[in-house]
Structure formats: C-alpha cells, structure tokens
C-alpha cells in the first residue's frame, strides 16, 4: 500500500497556489485567476525511490475563509507557505499563516516549506531572495523560489516538503525511542532497587530468626524449677528447690568417708589409753585382768 502524504498549500490570494498545484498534477499552467475555495488533488509519484501518493489540498487565501482553512490545517501533515515575489504584502502575510498553523496543530514544530512563486517576474520583484531565505530560516524550514508558468522548482517544492515530513517523523520516532529506552532504564533501576531491598529484608529476617533460635536454645539448656518451669535466668542451673540436692548427697558421702578414716584412729587411741591405765594401776600395786 502506498504511503499517502497530506499536503496543504497556504498563502494569500493571487500568489499562484492553484497554478503550482495544477502544474504538479496536470503538468500545465493555468493563466487566468479563479479564486479557490477548496480543491483537492491526488497524484502518484516516485520520491527517493519510493512510490508515494500525494494528496494536495489547495486552500482559499481570502481572510473570510480563515475558519474553513483551519479545518484543512488540522488534517495536513505538511504545508507549503506560498508568497509572490512581486507582492510584498503576500510575503508579510506568511507570518500570520505560520502562526495559525502552529496554533491549529498545537505545536511549535510543523513540517513547512516556504515558496517564493513567480520568480519569472524578475523585473517586478518586491521581495529579494535573501529576504525569503531569512524568513524560512526563522521558521526553521527549507526555501525555494518557483515559477508555475515556467515549471521551475515545482516538483522540487512538493517533493522537498515530503522529505521534510519524513525528517520530522524520523525525529519524532527517535525521540519516542529514546524516551522508551529511558523509561526501560528507569524501570530496570527501580527493579534493581526493589530486588536489593528484598535481599536486605531477607537478610534481616534471617538474622532475626537466628537471634530467636539462639535465645530459645539458651532457654532450653537452662535450669528447670520444681514445677517444671524453665529458669528465667538462663544460667544453666536449677532453681533453689533442687539446686542443693547434688551438694547434699556429696557432703553425706564425704562425711561417711571421713568417719571410716577416723574409726581406726579412734581404736588406736583407745588402745593407747588402755595401756596407759594398765601401766598406772600396775605401778599402784594393782593388777587388772583385761
């Protein structure tokens, strides 16, 4: 399917808008002036090795058709701003036409091309080439001088506008691509931050669980009271109800061992005491049979 370009020809009355359009479409020059309200033309052509379809709208230049002209401007992709080199007034009108286009399109950058028509009327020139070029530069768009009568730069004007549209669309596409890449980068950065935050949360959760497990282990290894309740001190001992039981058993065993060690010593002391008493009685002349 052919790519279709909607081109709108804008300018004051009598500057040759219809003559340019008919010369492009029908390849002949219309000499008489017939004020146009609106005419639409279509032509298939080849631009930069591509088959395209040009839909050219020739608009009325009179001020009374300004509201109607705005409707055409809304549908246009690119605009030829046409003045006549032998009419200073038509040249000065282009500023208001350009402002109207920007207002209707709600943009400060629209594909346009400034055309100084009737360059064959050099002897009647009121607008210099330099002035036309300066105006185009202020609009940031290309500039051509044309002659519909002599078919000078007619195709170049319309084809140049198509190229301008393509460049404009390419810039828009590139800007959208960069914006999409920036959005993807922002999403990736946000996702990375979310993952980092999740990892920190997981690490904190693992740390808290480890602390809780250590506390539980310390409590289990602590003492148990007589009622089976874990000692809150967590010191590994038992409560006072049973804390002294091993110590008491140990003391009793030690006393038994000491008593057993003391019995032979006591017997030896008793024997020694008996011998002393026997010796004493023998000295006193008494004899005791034991």
Swiss-Prot record:
It holds the Pfam family Ras. It comes from Candida albicans (strain SC5314 / ATCC MYA-2876) (Yeast). SUPFAM superfamilies: P-loop containing nucleoside triphosphate hydrolases. Keywords: Cell membrane, GTP-binding, Lipoprotein, Membrane, Methylation, Nucleotide-binding, Palmitate, Prenylation. Signal peptide: none annotated. Residues 178-216, 246-283 have a biased composition (Low complexity). Alternates between an inactive form bound to GDP and an active form bound to GTP. Activated by a guanine nucleotide-exchange factor (GEF) and inactivated by a GTPase-activating protein (GAP). Residues 176-290 are annotated as: Disordered. The gene is RAS1. It is found in: Cell membrane. It is a lipid-anchor. InterPro entries: P-loop_NTPase, Small_GTP-bd, Small_GTPase, Small_GTPase_Ras-type. This is Ras-like protein 1. The keyword Secreted does not apply.
